[in-house]
Regions:
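Predominantly soluble domains enriched in secretory-pathway, periplasmic, or organellar proteins
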Residues: 1-108
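N-terminal pro-sequences and low-complexity stem/linker regions of secreted or lumenal proteins
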Residues: 80-424
Length: 424
């Protein structure tokens, strides 16, 4: 930690190279540094789809080698300034200058200063899986999409498409991650640790993302939820950064119920044939992350494609209704609904529809509750790895649903990433 006042800073300067430098060698004969950059210039390798469309994917990294003459002091100072600019570290100074807000200022949805009051009291972060912008929204005429790549367009995802008739369409939103192993870090920590990033593509410490138990897979600055907890804000975590302890069915058996069992249970519950879910206490989960364990809903499923998202929503809904009635809806709720990933028992189209319905139901319940006027719902993918996009493999759907998320024009093409959403 070079920011610590207790540690002498051994860094004399910084040299700009490629993305994710993983090794360096000094050529003493030529007085040069040779730096191997794991991700180099990023995922700019393109290929043509079966439809003849040039497209990109998150796995097409272009590694590079930087050959850098050993700089003198003046050149090193210039290089250091370039690194500072490349990494936008000047923005960190802007954040510091935005602190010191006035708690007595007039509340607005997004305060200009940290510490100013906000009209938003309840934040819901819905995490989904693996889709590019074009895969889901390529058929939306208002945005920069390619309809030929919209394999899960409006026919499979009518609810998220309907959202865009009222709320903003972001057609220039990106997930920095390659896949789940670093995607969950980007969402919850606003960065993937160096120890995680240079493992690409193996990720022996953190894959599959929410299942990591190694502290080296986490940023030392903490998580979105640990910061909320440190600020004394109530929060609940549904599925993120957790692992299963065991399954235990009502008859005492410890095998996992089938997808059909969970689905039938949800149908009966939603139709009023059951007052509670038969399998609601089947799952017991835990987390090795203390900030998660203290706020974890322990009967909510983790990443498991053998469980429909309707069951997840029904579990959350029971909890949400109790909180609404008691006036205890948390400030921050994280919900991981992942059937959009595909790979479970149903067909891919059915899994997309299951997830789309789940997202629609969550928004429907929140928007018809007494906390809607003070709520903001953020929806994003952990990564965009399982598809292609005609702009960039990292371009992904991102949604903000709130009384304060006003649609202005056909699309917002401002460059945003998961970091912007986490920061907001």
């Amino acid at each position: 930690d070079l920011t610590s006042a207790a540690v002498a800073n051994p860094v004399k300067g910084m040299i700009p190279v490629g993305y994710a430098p993983s090794s360096v060698v000094l050529d003493q004969v030529k007085n040069e540094l040779l730096v191997a950059n794991d991700k180099g210039i990023g995922t700019r390798y393109s290929f043509e789809t079966d439809y003849g469309v040039t497209s990109y994917n998150t796995h097409q990294d272009n590694g590079t080698v930087s050959i850098v003459p050993i700089p003198d002091s003046a050149t090193l100072q210039t290089m250091t300034s370039q690194v500072w600019e490349n990494n936008h570290w000047d923005l960190a100074q802007n954040i510091k200058s935005a602190s010191g807000g006035n708690p007595h200022a007039k509340p607005v949805a997004l305060p200009n200063k940290i510490g100013d009051p906000s009209l938003i009291k309840h934040v819901f972060l819905i995490i989904r899986e693996n889709r590019t912008y074009d895969q889901i929204l390529g058929d939306v005429a208002a945005g920069n999409g390619d309809p030929s790549l919209a394999v899960f367009g409006g026919k499979d995802t009518p609810n998220v498409h309907a959202l865009l008739k009222r709320f903003p369409l972001f057609d220039n939103f990106y997930d920095p991650s390659r896949q789940s192993a670093d995607g969950h870090q980007w969402i919850t920590e606003a960065m993937a640790p160096y120890a995680d990033d240079i493992q690409s593509p193996d990720w022996v410490r953190s894959y599959p993302g929410g299942n990591a138990g190694d502290a080296l897979a986490y940023q030392n600055k903490g998580f979105l939820f640990s910061e909320a907890a440190a600020a004394g804000l109530p929060l609940k975590i549904y599925g993120e950064y957790v692992e299963y302890d065991t399954f235990k069915q009502p008859d005492g058996t410890t095998t996992e119920p089938s997808w059909s069992d969970f689905y039938t249970d949800s149908k009966h519950f939603e139709a009023g044939l059951e007052k509670t879910l038969k399998y609601q206490n089947t799952i017991r989960a835990h987390s090795s992350v203390p900030a998660v364990y203290l706020h974890l809903i322990k009967n909510f499923p983790i990443f498991d494609l053998g469980i429909p998202d309707q069951f997840r929503v029904d579990l959350w809904l029971q909890d949400f209704r109790k909180d609404v009635a008691a006036g205890t809806v948390p400030t921050l709720s994280l919900l991981w609904v992942m059937d959009v990933h595909t790979g479970g028992p149903p067909t891919p189209d059915a899994e997309q529809a299951d997830n789309d319905l789940a997202v629609g139901r969550i928004i429907d319940y929140i928007s018809h509750s007494n906390v809607w006027s003070t709520s903001a719902i953020f929806i994003e993918e952990d990564d965009a790895q399982n598809g292609v996009d005609h702009v960039d493999g990292h371009r992904s759907p991102g949604y903000i649903v709130s009384p304060y998320a006003v649609q202005q024009g056909p699309a917002d093409s401002t460059y945003y990433t998961q970091v912007n959403m986490t920061r907001t």
